Amino acid sequence: MNLVSLKDIVFGYSHTPVLDKVSLDIESGEFVGITGPNGASKSTLIKVMLGMLKPWEGTVTISKRNTEGKRLTIGYVPQQISSFNAGFPSTVLELVQSGRYTKGKWFKRLNEEDHLEVEKALKMVEMWDLRHRKIGDLSGGQKQKICIARMLASNPDLLMLDEPTTAVDYDSRKGFYEFMHHLVKNHNRTVVMVTHEQNEVQQFLDKVIRLERGEKGGWKCLTWNSCDELF
């Protein structure tokens, strides 16, 4: 079952195309890595998939339902973590708890399941012991971790991650890859992740999408269904 399909996508800035006839399919239950050199428009590709950027040409299709027939939910962690506004949420715990709020139910009363999911997400990124710390007192790497935790707490079917581990240490990155692999293989999640840590993550990936320069100057997609084919 295809969750995401791109067909002949062309997109650019001003009058310069950066994605040139990009086509790809992402199936349910895959751990997909998007790679390529710096400036290869990997972040742009993710934003086109999410509908944050409208392509000049081509079509983007995202399934409205998961494999169980329920409404598909999507989690997104951007490359650049925006600065958090003062006020609510003011602590690590409050921010991650907000991942459990559904649309139209901000400040809902959290139940036992909600609290367990929040605790599990914070422990996964090794931030449980800092749950009462003010967000303004966190380092860049810690802010990146709690953004990941907030997404995990929402239990999305499709996880879209734009270099989510750039500011964290090697052991934390490895643990994160292992957990993503666990979600894919044991909980029927689908993960799409932009990464530069190819050597670290390759053993966990089901598919690799690499952006390479096309003849007209834009970036094209090459897809490998086995990491061994690329690496």
From Swiss-Prot:
Residues in ABC transporter domain copies: 4-230
Membrane topology: Peripheral membrane protein
Knockout mutant characteristics: Disruption results in low transformability.
SUPFAM superfamilies: P-loop containing nucleoside triphosphate hydrolases
Enzyme class: translocase
PROSITE patterns: ABC_TRANSPORTER_1 (PS00211), ABC_TRANSPORTER_2 (PS50893)
Assigned GO CC terms: ATP-binding cassette (ABC) transporter complex
Subcellular localization(s) per the UniProt record: Cell membrane
Molecular function via GO: ABC-type zinc transporter activity; ATP binding; ATP hydrolysis activity; ATPase-coupled transmembrane transporter activity
Catalytic activities: Zn(2+)(out) + ATP(in) + H2O(in) = Zn(2+)(in) + ADP(in) + phosphate(in) + H(+)(in)
EC number(s) per entry: 7.2.2.20
Induction comment: Repressed by zinc via the metallo-regulatory protein Zur.
Pfam families for this protein: ABC_tran
Record's keyword terms, sorted: ATP-binding, Cell membrane, Ion transport, Membrane, Nucleotide-binding, Translocase, Transport, Zinc, Zinc transport
Gene3D superfamilies from the UniProt entry: P-loop containing nucleotide triphosphate hydrolases
Family assignment from sequence similarity: Belongs to the ABC transporter superfamily.
Subunit structure comment from the entry: The complex is composed of two ATP-binding proteins (ZnuC), two transmembrane proteins (ZnuB) and a solute-binding protein (ZnuA).
Protein's job: Part of the high-affinity ABC transporter complex ZnuABC involved in zinc import. Responsible for energy coupling to the transport system. ZnuABC-mediated zinc transport is required for comF expression and competence development.
Official protein name in the record: High-affinity zinc uptake system ATP-binding protein ZnuC
Organism this protein belongs to: Bacillus subtilis (strain 168)
Gene, per the UniProt record: znuC
